[in-house]
Amino acid sequence: DETVARNYAETLFELARKHEGLDVYGAGIGTIASLLDADPKFRLFLETPRIAEADKKAVVRKVFEGELPRQLVNFILITIDKRRQRLLRDIAREFDALVDDHLGRAHVEVTVARPLDDTTKDLVARRLTALLGKTAIPHVRVRPEVLGGMIVRAGDTIYDGSVRRRLEDMRRQLLRA
């Protein structure tokens, strides 16, 4: 399903680049994903096989035509035709990742022992931007067991500068001696 969602997201991304733009399409597919997350009845209506595709498409047209770009509404209708509407939330996530990559942005998970003030957050973002060569968008998580320092996860790479890790390294060295 992830590969299928990625393929649909790539198609939507190309469509967005040719028409109204990445912002408009990103907001539109994000609105749909948020609606599916927030409204279980709408999600069930759209995803259940018991309701005819024609009825689903009629509701989508009524709700979204005039609110979203025509090509985006047509894209949603195609997902219904292909019985892939349950992937719309995944498609939205993949689309956002494609936009971030295209714009040179990287979402980075930063784990710290205590909350960071705004000045420190800005400093971390600037240093990560320099390190990654992309605009870093840090998502800070507070976990007291880190003890101090920070752990940074950027994609598949982890930079562990935590006090806990340094203490574990010292412990291993002492045990070897």
Positions of the model-derived regions?
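Elongated, mostly alpha-helical coiled-coil "stalk/stator" tethers of large membrane protein machines
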Residues: 1-177
